[in-house]
Curated annotation (Swiss-Prot):
<feature type="domain" description="PTS EIIA type-3">
    <location>
        <begin position="15"/>
        <end position="113"/>
    </location>
</feature>
<keyword id="KW-0808">Transferase</keyword>
<keyword id="KW-0963">Cytoplasm</keyword>
<keyword id="KW-0762">Sugar transport</keyword>
<dbReference type="GO" id="GO:1902495">
    <property type="term" value="C:transmembrane transporter complex"/>
</dbReference>
<dbReference type="GO" id="GO:0009401">
    <property type="term" value="P:phosphoenolpyruvate-dependent sugar phosphotransferase system"/>
</dbReference>
<dbReference type="GO" id="GO:0032991">
    <property type="term" value="C:protein-containing complex"/>
</dbReference>
<comment type="function">
    <text>The phosphoenolpyruvate-dependent sugar phosphotransferase system (sugar PTS), a major carbohydrate active transport system, catalyzes the phosphorylation of incoming sugar substrates concomitantly with their translocation across the cell membrane. The enzyme II ChbABC PTS system is involved in the transport of the chitin disaccharide N,N'-diacetylchitobiose (GlcNAc2). Also able to use N,N',N''-triacetyl chitotriose (GlcNAc3).</text>
</comment>
<dbReference type="Pfam" id="PF02255">
    <property type="entry name" value="PTS_IIA"/>
</dbReference>
<feature type="active site" description="Tele-phosphohistidine intermediate">
    <location>
        <position position="89"/>
    </location>
</feature>
<dbReference type="GO" id="GO:1902815">
    <property type="term" value="P:N,N'-diacetylchitobiose import"/>
</dbReference>
<dbReference type="InterPro" id="IPR036542">
    <property type="entry name" value="PTS_IIA_lac/cel_sf"/>
</dbReference>
<dbReference type="GO" id="GO:0005829">
    <property type="term" value="C:cytosol"/>
</dbReference>
<dbReference type="GO" id="GO:0090566">
    <property type="term" value="F:protein-phosphocysteine-N,N'-diacetylchitobiose phosphotransferase system transporter activity"/>
</dbReference>
<keyword id="KW-0813">Transport</keyword>
<comment type="subunit">
    <text>Forms a complex with ChbB (EIIB). ChbA is a homotrimer. The interface of the homotrimer is stabilized by metal cations such as magnesium, copper or nickel.</text>
</comment>
<feature type="modified residue" description="Phosphohistidine; by HPr">
    <location>
        <position position="89"/>
    </location>
</feature>
Length: 116
């Protein structure tokens, strides 16, 4: 992983940052996809599978959040990092995935209560 304490000045470092940001998008998307798959399992009454998928979703989201935290720490609120459209897209993916997981957790609990 690139050194996020030194925000890129060269094309190679910019490419490394883009790779890190793409990882953020991929992990966020994975977290959201797994959460929706868990909801599908809950609708079918398979709460063990739903829980396992939500656990996997949490791990993917934790990976994404770790990258986000390092990016924020690297910038330290000083505007060192150039904000690209891809970075904004990655942040959007992360936030929508976090929201989806929170809502899906509630929906799974409701399905569980309804099936009891």
């Amino acid at each position: 992983m690139m050194d996020l304490d030194n925000i890129p000045d060269t094309q190679t470092e910019a490419e490394e940052l883009e790779e890190v940001v793409m990882g953020l998008i991929i992990n966020s998307g994975q977290a959201r996809s797994l959460a929706y798959a868990a909801l599908k399992q809950a609708k079918q009454g398979d709460f063990a599978a739903a829980k396992a998928m939500m656990d996997q979703s949490r791990m993917a989201l934790n990976e994404a959040h770790l990258v986000q935290t390092k990016l924020i720490e690297g910038d330290a609120g000083e505007g060192k990092m150039k904000v690209s459209l891809v970075l904004v897209h990655a942040q959007d993916h992360l936030m929508t995935s976090m929201l989806a997981r929170e809502l899906i957790t509630e929906l799974i609990e409701l399905h569980e209560k309804l099936k009891a």
